[in-house]
């Protein structure tokens, strides 16, 4: 398995992390802005190259940290949603 990250220079509040395994790219995107948004989805096929074009390789530990941030944010967002 390979791990990557990419930051949007135009929007530094967006952080993107990817893991590539078995021809599928798992994308974890964290947006820190007025509303924190977390996206977690998979991409297959030719689109993978587009996503990895400006990405740099990272280690598993860094990717796992991004996953743990997402897990914590999802818990917080769910809690806030159900307690409005």
Please provide the spans of the model-predicted regions.
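A short beta-strand micro-motif
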Residues: 2-9
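Sequence-level detector for tyrosine residue identity
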Residues: 3, 41-42, 51, 79-81
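Acidic, low-complexity, intrinsically disordered interaction modules
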Residues: 12-66
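Charged interaction segments
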Residues: 56-84
């Amino acid at each position: 398995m390979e791990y990557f990250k990419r930051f949007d220079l135009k929007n530094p509040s967006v952080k993107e992390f990817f893991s590539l395994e078995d021809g599928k790219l798992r994308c974890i995107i964290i947006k820190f802005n007025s509303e924190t948004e977390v996206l977690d989805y998979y991409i297959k096929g030719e689109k993978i190259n587009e996503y990895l074009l400006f990405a740099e390789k990272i280690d598993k530990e860094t990717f796992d940290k991004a996953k743990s941030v997402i897990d914590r944010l999802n818990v917080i967002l769910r809690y806030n949603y159900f307690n409005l």
